[in-house]
């Protein structure tokens, strides 16, 4: 803050998978819904305020002692800034781009004619991007639990069991481990979406995608493919190509490497194996992951939406690059991983995980 000439930072959060992480990071409070704001002065104690219905989980020992509830948190921020004499200078807002509400920002800005409010998103994202040893321990535990949930899905699926019944068995694992925020997607045939009360056919391929916000507030993203027909020659070739690309990307992912370099490494392996590349699709090949399911930095093969950056030791990424190929492959590999950047390359957060298809008998 001092280096950036800030007298304070206002941290904004909202109860959703992409925007509650700021609040959890600074206050260890898991938001269910609603809005939350934290005032962190350069000198003095912080203040945290939430709408009354926002809290889902509070720490036994509050990290921020000055904790308030208010139907309009921004008004309490105004009060606290006046109490602390923060009526001039430069104040950063972390979450200005996507987290703070328009009304909240306008109320705070209009209350202080002598304060210059500036975007502090990148400053806070850079701090959060490097995970502590404790966070890495929590992430490894979360990924281990995520794998157990996926294994349970594989154990129970079969012809006739409904999508919801199968997904619920996986949910028993992560609910029992303290996770209450998730995304579960099932893909079979032409259907892809939230589980429905529809029997699985289990005659071709079933894909199960799981994103979990764990007890510590961190996220994981993992996928499993259950194949009821052996891979064709082309499918097996692409599976092998993408698995080799995963290994090459891990080796390349050292401090100083750009995310675009990882994308180029992935694509080069595919091309070297004799594939021609189709048109890119809009998705993130790599994105930071921590207390938000998607965090800076991130890379997309499309120009729009990129936040490319050099890798730093301790960063954590979700890995899921892909590119349509020529010739086209009907069933694609769907390889997902999570890894932490080390000086020796990427260390996977999975443990003895089978990234290849599960061939169901």
Predicted features along the sequence, with ranges:
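Active-site neighborhoods and metal-handling regions in enzymes and metal-associated proteins
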Residues: 1-361
């Amino acid at each position: 803050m001092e280096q950036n000439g800030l007298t304070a930072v206002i941290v904004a959060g909202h109860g959703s998978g992409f925007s509650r992480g700021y609040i959890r990071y600074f206050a260890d409070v898991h938001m269910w819904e609603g809005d939350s704001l934290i005032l962190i002065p350069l000198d003095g104690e912080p203040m945290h305020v939430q709408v009354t219905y926002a809290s889902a989980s509070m720490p036994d020992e509050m990290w921020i002692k000055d904790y308030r509830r208010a139907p309009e948190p921004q008004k309490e921020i105004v009060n606290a800034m006046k109490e602390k004499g923060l009526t001039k200078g430069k104040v950063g807002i972390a979450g200005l781009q996507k987290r703070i509400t328009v009304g909240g920002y306008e109320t705070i800005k209009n209350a202080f004619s002598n304060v210059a409010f500036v975007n502090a998103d990148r400053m806070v994202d850079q701090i959060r991007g490097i995970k502590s040893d404790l966070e890495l321990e929590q992430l490894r535990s979360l990924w281990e639990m995520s794998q157990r949930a996926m294994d349970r899905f594989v154990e129970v699926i079969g012809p006739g069991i409904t999508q919801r019944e199968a997904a619920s068995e996986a949910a028993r694992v992560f609910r029992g481990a303290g996770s209450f925020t998730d995304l579960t997607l099932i893909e079979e045939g032409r259907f892809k979406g939230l589980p429905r009360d529809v029997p699985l056919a289990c005659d071709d391929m079933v894909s199960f995608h799981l994103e979990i916000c764990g007890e510590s507030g961190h996220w994981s993203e993992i996928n499993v493919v259950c194949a009821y027909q052996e891979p064709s020659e082309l499918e097996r070739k692409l599976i092998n190509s993408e698995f080799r690309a995963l290994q090459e990307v891990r080796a390349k992912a050292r401090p100083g490497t750009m995310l675009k370099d990882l994308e180029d490494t992935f694509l080069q392996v595919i091309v070297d194996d004799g594939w021609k590349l189709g048109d890119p699709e809009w998705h993130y090949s790599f994105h930071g992951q921590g207390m938000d399911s998607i965090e800076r930095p991130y890379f997309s093969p499309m120009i729009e939406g990129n936040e490319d950056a050099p890798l730093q030791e301790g960063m954590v990424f979700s890995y899921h690059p892909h590119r349509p190929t020529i010739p086209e492959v009907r069933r694609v590999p769907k390889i997902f991983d999570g890894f932490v950047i080390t000086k020796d390359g990427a260390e996977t957060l999975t443990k003895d995980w089978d990234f290849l298809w599960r061939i169901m008998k």
